[in-house]
């Protein structure tokens, strides 16, 4: 039994499922999760000392790579002054100013502790500001585990939501409308059915929780126009895409302006931070200047703020945005070319510092329904072949991969060498 297997057994005795977030349990790919002891740069090291090229990056935050010296020194310096004060600090102002500078649609921002908290608070604010109850989200998009957003589509193309988890009351979920990602007509139908009831539309601009699905041309702009027409707020969830698809977020890359934006992951530099922000008029509707309540014991934590400041200041440096995109493109095109050589049907989506691998005979993957038709068994085999060779991909066919600025061309070359071997071991037949 490996050390990881021993630890996983111990963990299952005291932690539900042995993990503190479900995808880490390797249920999607099978086998025993790898327990990590340390990380540096583009690499993670398991408890037995094996090194892996890491394309998970703590699920997105480690855009500079692990243990970046600028972040580490900033955190250690601030930690000497105290871990948490529960008061305003200059650091939270500095991070807020940085965010507003980099994301022009954000005129004011409120710090929270996670992406879930950010989306939950933004939804509450939208409901309070518009005095409407219903919200509209998209099938396959994930916005955290708050009750309003753990909702799936029911039968038919347009439906009131049904809970996707026990513990979410149907009476609560019925206020959530679920539409098809990249299908603007389904959204138009919803607005026509509930013209004065929808408080907001919330969307992942790049859907990173059904792997990596890019928006079709004019989809995001179409959502913006519909929200304008019906008086609903448009919320872009940039928890995953913020500062990663582009320095100004996916909204900058796709040239669309939301009313509210949610952030997380990258803005904490590896520390637990979330944020939501937008137009000043809307943000001033939140307490203490407005009636919509939101609070948090550790919001604006000085150590987390210092990590976020250091991270964003590094990202701002000339050439970093372009280099991140270049590395991602090299990996994505390399994987596609190798798959073609081995006669394995593969779609690779990518943008900025995100990518997604789909084993499928489809020409493109632009929707949830197309994503779930992909060959999950083949992905799982590929995942384990890569893991054996020291390449750590997301342990699920429905999670995006993440590039970091610590990755090098040599890392990409090593990854492609491993993929060549992995593809050779896969049969190119039996696709559904």
From Swiss-Prot:
One of its GO terms (molecular function) is glutamate-1-semialdehyde 2,1-aminomutase activity. It catalyses: (S)-4-amino-5-oxopentanoate = 5-aminolevulinate. SUPFAM superfamilies: PLP-dependent transferases. PROSITE patterns: AA_TRANSFER_CLASS_3. Its main location: cytoplasm. The modification N6-(pyridoxal phosphate)lysine is found at residue 265. Keywords: Cytoplasm, Isomerase, Porphyrin biosynthesis, Pyridoxal phosphate. It comes from the Bacteria. Homodimer. Belongs to the class-III pyridoxal-phosphate-dependent aminotransferase family. HemL subfamily. This is Glutamate-1-semialdehyde 2,1-aminomutase. The lineage of its organism: Bacteria, Pseudomonadati, Pseudomonadota, Gammaproteobacteria, Pasteurellales.
């Amino acid at each position: 039994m490996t050390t990881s297997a021993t630890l996983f057994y111990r963990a299952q005795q005291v932690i539900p499922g042995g993990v503190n977030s479900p995808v880490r349990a390797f249920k999607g790919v099978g086998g025993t999760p790898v327990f990590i002891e340390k990380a540096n740069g583009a690499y993670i090291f398991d408890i037995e000392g094996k090194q892996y090229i890491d394309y998970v990056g703590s699920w997105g935050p480690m855009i500079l790579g692990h243990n970046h010296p600028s972040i580490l020194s900033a955190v250690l310096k601030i930690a000497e002054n105290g871990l948490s004060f529960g008061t305003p600090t200059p650091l939270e102002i500095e991070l807020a100013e940085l965010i507003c500078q980099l994301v022009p649609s954000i005129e004011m921002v409120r710090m929270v502790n996670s992406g879930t908290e950010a989306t939950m608070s933004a939804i509450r604010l939208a409901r309070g500001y518009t005095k409407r109850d219903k919200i509209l989200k998209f099938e396959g998009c994930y916005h955290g585990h708050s009750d309003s957003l753990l909702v799936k589509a029911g039968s038919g193309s347009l439906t009131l939501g049904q809970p996707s988890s026990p513990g979410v009351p149907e009476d609560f979920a019925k206020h959530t409308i679920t539409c098809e990602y990249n299908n603007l007509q389904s959204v138009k139908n919803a607005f026509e059915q509930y013209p004065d009831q929808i408080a907001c539309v919330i969307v992942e601009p790049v859907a990173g929780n059904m792997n990596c699905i890019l928006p079709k041309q004019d989809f995001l702009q179409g959502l913006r126009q519909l929200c304008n027409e019906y008086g609903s707020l448009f919320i872009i969830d940039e928890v995953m895409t913020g500062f990663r698809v582009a320095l100004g977020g996916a909204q900058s890359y796709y040239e669309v302006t939301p009313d509210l934006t949610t952030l997380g992951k990258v803005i904490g530099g590896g520390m637990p931070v979330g944020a939501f922000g937008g137009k000043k008029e809307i943000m001033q509707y939140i307490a203490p200047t407005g009636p919509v309540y939101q609070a948090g014991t550790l919001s604006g934590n000085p150590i987390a703020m210092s990590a976020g400041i250091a991270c964003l200041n590094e990202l701002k440096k000339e050439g970093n945005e372009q280099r991140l995109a270049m590395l991602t493109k090299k990996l994505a095109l390399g994987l596609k070319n190798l798959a073609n050589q081995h006669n394995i049907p593969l779609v690779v989506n990518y943008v900025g510092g995100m990518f997604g691998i789909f084993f499928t005979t489809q020409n493109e993957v632009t929707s949830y329904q197309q994503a779930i038709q992909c060959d999950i068994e083949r992905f799982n085999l590929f995942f384990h072949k890569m893991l054996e060779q020291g390449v750590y991909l997301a342990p699920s066919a429905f999670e995006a991969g993440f590039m970091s600025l610590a990755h090098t061309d040599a890392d990409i070359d090593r990854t492609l060498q491993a993929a060549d071997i992995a593809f050779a071991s896969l049969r190119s037949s039996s696709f559904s």
